[in-house]
């Protein structure tokens, strides 16, 4: 009897990388990699578009460390676009379209704006966008009468510190120091406002030199959309908000609806970087590439909170899925993203060695300070909630179209994920430091100086159950947990 078995498939715990002659020291390894042809990451890490993983705070922190976060779509269109805008505005070389105020605005109205936007400095312009002043926290701090207008208390035009477009960093910093100001306004020859530069952005850039930024010095951010009807409006809003890369996200990327959504989006936005997924075969990867995807995301059911393989009986173990997709796309230069199943830094190294250009993680970043959600105490330990986008709770909030169930009533949803909790882990930068440290050590051991070399040069051995048992801590009780090794 023929069972139509296609091949034997392997996952992370089935293989190990082989050490090789090396001239590479871990601290000299180069971790930069391509997300798409246009976007280069400084570390090969992306955060999953999940509602317990990525919103503004985590996307900002990850971009500052050199990766990119994908804002989840379990929210209204306006809210998701607003999250993207917040990341883009958090750190700018030049704030190209600063929020401005008119001179007749009252201080009470200004106070509302400050509360809403989270910053207190606004250029003051007339109806023609001519710069006439600036108002900052210093101007308003001790004013009691909130019925006064901006024009009565602002710093007037003749006292402004301005620069022309294209001024050098040194010139700007010298001006800031000379005039003891924290904001410099950028104007053209006819004194029309063109932008604003703040000292905070210079400080942030110095503190985080590895940050993943666009050509204007703004942090990069991605956002997820579904493939179902009604997502056109969401895509348009995200593009308008300045999203760097769009993720067309589905549990089954090798589906005609997803392919059609990729084709339509590519036709409308020919230069927009588009990541599409998820697939687990060479054929699926090729289909998405043919439809116009800039990068392909691989992983059907490997995630810790995912039950797709058990509920549906469908999936491909992750190392084989990555290797097949990467081999199929090798000649096209389209990167593969390994999504799911990553528990240790060694798994990141194995995913890249199998052919992935970068990895997307959920559970590794869930539970961090920056992840959405409150810290809960349970039996004396701190936890944060973590759930699959295929869990009942997430599907009821809007992710059901990812699993082709958008028309189902809440009590008729068939979940492909669970809701759980994960130990509180502290700040994201500490997690990234440990994970990238492990990856650097791997590159030293295998003699690979770059991510590209690791993708193409490193060799695997297949191991048995006894081999994985030997690899883990054994025959000893752990008395002090290591920051990069947690079992269970």
UniProtKB/Swiss-Prot annotation:
Pathway assigned to this chain's UniProt record: Purine metabolism; XMP biosynthesis via de novo pathway; XMP from IMP: step 1/1
Residues annotated as binding K(+): 301, 303, 306, 470-472
Catalytic residue positions: 306, 402
Regulation: Mycophenolic acid (MPA) is a non-competitive inhibitor that prevents formation of the closed enzyme conformation by binding to the same site as the amobile flap. In contrast, mizoribine monophosphate (MZP) is a competitive inhibitor that induces the closed conformation. MPA is a potent inhibitor of mammalian IMPDHs but a poor inhibitor of the bacterial enzymes. MZP is a more potent inhibitor of bacterial IMPDH.
InterPro entries assigned to the protein according to its UniProt record, in alphabetical order: Aldolase_TIM, CBS_dom, CBS_dom_sf, IMP_DH, IMP_DH/GMP_Rdtase_CS, IMP_DH_GMPRt
SMART domains hit by this protein: CBS, IMPDH
Catalytic reaction annotation: IMP + NAD(+) + H2O = XMP + NADH + H(+)
Record-listed IMP binding positions: 304, 339-341, 362-363, 386-390, 416
Domain CBS: 94-150, 154-215
Cofactor annotation: K(+)
Xref: Pfam families: CBS (PF00571), IMPDH (PF00478)
Positions annotated to bind NAD(+): 249-251, 299-301
Gene Ontology biological process terms in this record: GMP biosynthetic process; GTP biosynthetic process
EC code(s) of this entry: 1.1.1.205
PANTHER family: INOSINE-5'-MONOPHOSPHATE DEHYDROGENASE (PTHR11911:SF111), INOSINE-5-MONOPHOSPHATE DEHYDROGENASE RELATED (PTHR11911)
NCBIfam families recorded: IMP_dehydrog
Subunit structure: Homotetramer.
Protein name as it appears in the record: Inosine-5'-monophosphate dehydrogenase
